[in-house]
C-alpha cells in the first residue's frame, strides 16, 4: 500500500513539473537502462508510464508499455506471468462499455498470450476499427512498437494499423484502407500478408 502511495505522489509531482512530452521519453530511457540488471525496477518505471499514458490518453505509449511489461514479466517467472494475465483480464473487463480504445489495447495484449479461456480477444480488439483508425500515435512510439518494420506515415500513424499488424488481421486492414482510398497502405498490407505466408528461410533471405 505504501509503495502505491509513494508511486502516486511521484507521478503527481512529475505531471505537475513537466509536460507529458518531457516525462514519457525520460521514463522510457530509464526503463531501458534498468531492464537488463534491474528488471523489477524497470517494471515499476513501466507501471508509471502506464499510469501517465492512461491519464493523458497517450494510447500508443500505453500499448507499448503493456507490451514491454509483458516481455519483462515472461522472463521473470511463471507465477508472475499468471498474475499479470489476471491483471490484464481485469483491465479489459473494466474498460468494457467505458473506453473502447483501452479495451482494444488490453484485448490485443491478451490475444498475444496463452490465456486459457475462450474469450475471443483478437476479434474484440478490432470490433471498432473506425475508432482505432482515428487514433494517432507519435512516430517514435509507432516505430518502437513495430520495430521499425513499417513506415507509419503510410498508415497516418494510426492505432488500427499497429493492432491489426500485431494480430495479423491483414484482410480487415486491407478493407479499411481500401475504403479510405489509401493505396500505399493497401499495397503494404498485401505485401506483408504474402511475406507472412512464405517459409521462414525465405523471410530471412529478405
Give the positions of each predicted feature.
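N-terminal secretory signal peptides that target proteins for export/translocation
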Residues: 1-2
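Sec-dependent N-terminal signal peptides
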Residues: 5-14
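Hydrophobic alpha-helical membrane context
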Residues: 15-16, 159
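Boundary at the C-terminal end of the N-terminal hydrophobic targeting segment
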Residues: 19-21
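Extracytoplasmic/secretory-pathway proteins
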Residues: 24-30, 38-206
Amino acid at each position: 500500500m505504501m509503495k502505491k502511495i509513494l508511486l502516486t505522489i511521484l507521478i503527481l509531482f512529475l505531471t505537475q513539473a513537466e509536460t507529458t512530452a518531457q516525462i514519457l521519453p525520460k521514463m522510457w530511457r530509464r526503463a531501458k537502462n534498468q531492464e537488463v540488471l534491474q528488471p523489477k525496477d524497470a517494471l515499476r518505471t513501466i507501471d508509471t508510464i502506464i499510469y501517465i499514458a492512461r491519464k493523458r490518453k497517450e494510447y500508443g505509449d500505453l500499448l507499448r508499455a503493456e507490451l514491454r511489461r509483458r516481455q519483462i514479466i515472461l522472463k521473470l517467472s511463471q507465477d508472475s506471468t499468471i498474475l499479470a494475465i489476471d491483471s490484464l483480464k481485469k483491465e479489459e473487463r473494466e474498460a468494457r462499455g467505458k473506453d473502447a480504445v483501452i479495451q482494444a489495447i488490453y484485448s490485443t495484449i491478451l490475444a498475444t498470450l496463452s490465456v486459457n479461456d475462450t474469450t475471443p480477444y483478437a476479434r474484440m480488439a478490432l470490433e471498432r476499427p473506425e475508432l482505432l483508425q482515428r487514433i494517432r500515435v507519435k512516430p517514435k512510439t509507432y516505430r518502437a512498437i513495430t520495430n521499425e518494420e513499417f513506415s507509419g506515415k503510410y498508415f497516418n500513424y494510426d492505432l488500427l494499423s499497429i493492432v491489426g499488424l500485431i494480430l495479423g488481421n491483414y484482410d480487415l486492414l486491407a478493407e479499411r484502407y481500401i475504403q479510405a482510398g489509401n493505396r500505399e497502405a493497401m499495397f503494404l498490407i498485401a505485401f506483408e500478408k504474402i511475406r507472412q505466408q512464405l517459409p521462414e528461410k525465405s523471410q530471412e533471405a529478405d
